[in-house]
Amino acid sequence: MKKMNLILVAFCLLIQSCANDEGNYDYIDINEVEFGNINEEYNVMTNSTILEIDPTLTMTEGVSPDSDRFAYEWVCVASNGTKYTLATTRSINTIVSLPLGNYTLYLKVKDKVTDLQWTTSTYLTVGTIYTKGILLIGENEEGNAEAQMLSMVEDTKLISNILKNSGLPTLKGPINFIHTGTPYSSSYDVAVKVWVMTESGSYWLDRESMQGTIENHVSKILYTSLVPTEDLRIVDVAPQIINSRGSVGSNFYRAMVTSNGLVFSTSMGTNKDNYLDPVNRLSATSNDILHAFPFIFYPLKSYYGPVWYDTKNDRFMRATTSSTYSYTLVDNPNDPFPWNQGTTGRKLVYGENTYNKDGGKNSGNSFALMKDQQGEYFIYKMYAYGSRPEKIGAYQINLDIATNFSDATMYAFSSLRTVLFYVANNKLYAYDYDPGNEKLYQFDLFGSSEITMLKFDTQINPDANALYIATYDTASKGKLVRYVVNADPNIVTLTDDADNSWDGLIKVKNFSWRPQK
């Protein structure tokens, strides 16, 4: 107890002495640094591009930043922590020779008089000319499948003859050219692929060089004894990229559908990008495979297994991410349409996944265009979540308003409007299917040029409601233009984006976004 009292007294005396201390200190101003003229990010091509940064440094003491008093160091730090020193000068002007990837670039300034150090940072992406941009697939003048890229690593540059120079055999019937998205972690990097999909074969290319071989055929990642795999061709992959960074609706699961109606599903955590038996059957032991329409329905922002269409029995089916087979779907009272279309006589014509949020479905609704035996057309809107799909709405197309709809060969659903664009007899139409307010708009924008592609952007800037339209004529070759659909619900207009218009292209059939990974 006596010991505790002594401690308490000592503590009180200490507090009092601190309170009475009015100080007798000498304060010295120190030099401070303010950085400027450094961008938020830089993109370079390895062993090619000069990285040039000339920062401004304002010193509070008025000292010149070029004085011998200061030491400089530019350090790149990779995502795994590896460090690379690029320069030891205030400004940097050098060709970057780093492994491909994303880095944090630090500028460190040390005052050799005071030993104080200041640091600022920016982001550096090191890639090849193929690192980022728009992937195009279509036909060349000989009618063969060909691919191009609008590289956007620095200034936009058109790269042609990608397939011709890839090492792959000559291909026919272009379908798609896609990047599967940025991996969740480096352990998933093996599952990241650039796919070339054509009617004569599906192959993946090296992401850095765009080179491929016949050994990169889809059959090399399929492990099933139920069907021969040598001639299989991919026509759709889910999930796909949902933003310019390369994010996808799931980093752990993926599905593919082939041209002959097989649906494969995998867990990349377990199998990487390898696939076992097709899941479009009714039990894990069944050898009876149901033919699937060549499209996978799913919410763009949240993939949890495929919803697919059984063309043999005309019904929508589902499989979860862990399924080895598929499930039939049960209707609820007052549903806008039945999952089983066998009783309606309707068949699936076209499917599309969008960012439509009707019904509170923020991950995105899907659309199915149906046709019955009498030639009538219907739009089904659904939330195609693999474990729990929901129906959102159904609309019959008024063919008295939708001119030449039965002749349509291309379709595109707006995410933000009740509007279906279509091309019939080389004319572009927009049909507003809002019940009771149906309207039709025709756009004469392309003269005699052939319309070769119609597709909404769901990858680069989905919120813009941008429609990409490709055309072709023998004189000026292929052209791709980005149009923005207006928001006014009373009218449909298209505004062309002069900064996003490219010509001298192949006959474009499809496009997608290539992110930086």
Predicted stretch roles:
Residues 2-9:
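Sec-dependent signal peptide recognition
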Residues 157, 162-166, 178, 182, ...:
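Preference for solvent-exposed, low-hydrophobicity sequence contexts
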Residues 374-478:
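Intrinsically disordered, low-complexity segments enriched in Gly and acidic/Ser/Thr residues
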Residues 135-140, 197-200, 257-260, 369-372, ...:
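Recurrent small/Gly-Pro-centered beta-turn motifs in extracellular repeat architectures
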Residues 147, 177-178, 186, 408-413, ...:
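Hydrophobic core register within WD40 beta-propeller blades
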Residues 19-162, 166, 459-464, 472-517:
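Acidic/polar, low-complexity intrinsically disordered N-terminal segments immediately downstream
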Residues 131-132, 191-192, 251-253, 363-366, ...:
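Short coil/turn segments that connect the beta-strands within blades of beta-propeller domains
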Residues 14-17:
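C-terminal motif of bacterial Sec signal peptides marking the signal peptidase cleavage site
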